[in-house]
């Protein structure tokens, strides 16, 4: 009877977890398409100079520069297009990440079309800045319209130059690195005037307000996030932006836009005082970025201002190399402390076997192996409880409705027979956090995107296209259920719920990532084998 209740407990915990996730999604306000001017001016311009940051997106896409005028950069990882007006990155494609499994086209992250405006903007503001919401953007010159990282070349520099009316020369340098998704975006100001220049660099990501393509089984986030010296990582959704503009002073920090598996982020120098800001423009664009330190450039002097921009997958190693907190955009939820070691163990197994499906099987065997002592104790406790059923039935008949005496007698019996009535629950309670943590690892880890297993399972990050594994998982649950003797005293309602549980789980798992179904299926098969082995040992001891 206890084993049946444990299976019910699994089902209730599992369904509760899914309902809780869906409730969080449903309770979030819907994205706002447009904002009034009062929201745009919520931050104090006198304090933060946020009004100096250009906000010319309301005219897009009519103002988009013709494709032939864009500067195209090709590396081993990125295809980047830069608008010479302002030097903004208006297009990025990830060479080694396909748009779809059966499509060789690269995944496009940043783009500027009739449907979406998602770009990375940077510039110089302040008294002598060349980018302004009032004066307009600088029009840069470049030696070529096409740049490529050649074979044997590890670094590619793309310089853009602008000569101001006062004679000062501004060079905006994009530096690309082989094997990397981060781009150095630096400014060099050559003050050829007889007056001191004052400039401040900013970088911001502009994104059309768009609702995340999320579901109960695959909850994902699309929106902004930031980090400061006081807040290591915080999501800041489009709804949050509509409610309140960010204006946080910090040493270092970063600002990012997130979506499933991919991220774009501005990372200013870690030792500089910066301001992380956000806004919603009148054209319905969500903006998040940074304003850096103010630099005074003496006459005849040269000043370099640096920053980094990352545009690519949520690769934890690559993100950590840029900023110690940027890898937190791979959000494992409240069980991150459990998910991180699971992820590292999964990576370790994959490095050995070279197959993510096999790695999931190995991690399942590891988890089941670690929990085996508890599993054995669970089945032993359940066997003892079954042997006590006649005595418990006798007590129930003897004490009738006197629950107090019945409870005291039961506790004395458990103590005498050395039985823990809750002993069967502990392994179940330990399995659920592991299951949920692995669920987030499989959902968030870009390494599993388009990762094949075998036969018809060509992508472990999406559902089984033929629903074979969910059905096998349901069958395995049914077998486990039949191996557990049904107590005659069990409530009829519980019996019905137990009979339907494999069906309910099968339906739920139809839309789960194949990797997660594989974990649960293998776990069930191992549990069946363990159960048969443990029961054989118990029968030798006279416990059935």
From Swiss-Prot:
UniProt KW keywords: Cell inner membrane, Cell membrane, Chaperone, Membrane, Protein transport, Transmembrane, Transmembrane helix, Transport
GO cellular-component term (any): plasma membrane
Secretion signal, residue range per the UniProt entry: none
Compartments, as annotated in UniProt: Cell inner membrane
Membrane topology designation: Multi-pass membrane protein
Domain of life: Bacteria
Gene Ontology molecular-function annotations: membrane insertase activity
Major subcellular site: membrane
Pfam assignment, any one: 60KD_IMP
Segments traversing the membrane: 6-26, 345-365, 423-443, 460-480, 503-523
UniProt key word ATP-binding: no
Gene Ontology biological process terms in this record: protein insertion into membrane; protein transport
Quaternary structure annotation from Swiss-Prot or TrEMBL: Interacts with the Sec translocase complex via SecD. Specifically interacts with transmembrane segments of nascent integral membrane proteins during membrane integration.
Function as written in the Swiss-Prot or TrEMBL entry: Required for the insertion and/or proper folding and/or complex formation of integral membrane proteins into the membrane. Involved in integration of membrane proteins that insert both dependently and independently of the Sec translocase complex, as well as at least some lipoproteins. Aids folding of multispanning membrane proteins.
Family: Belongs to the OXA1/ALB3/YidC family. Type 1 subfamily.
This protein's name: Membrane protein insertase YidC
Species whose genome carries this gene: Shewanella woodyi (strain ATCC 51908 / MS32)
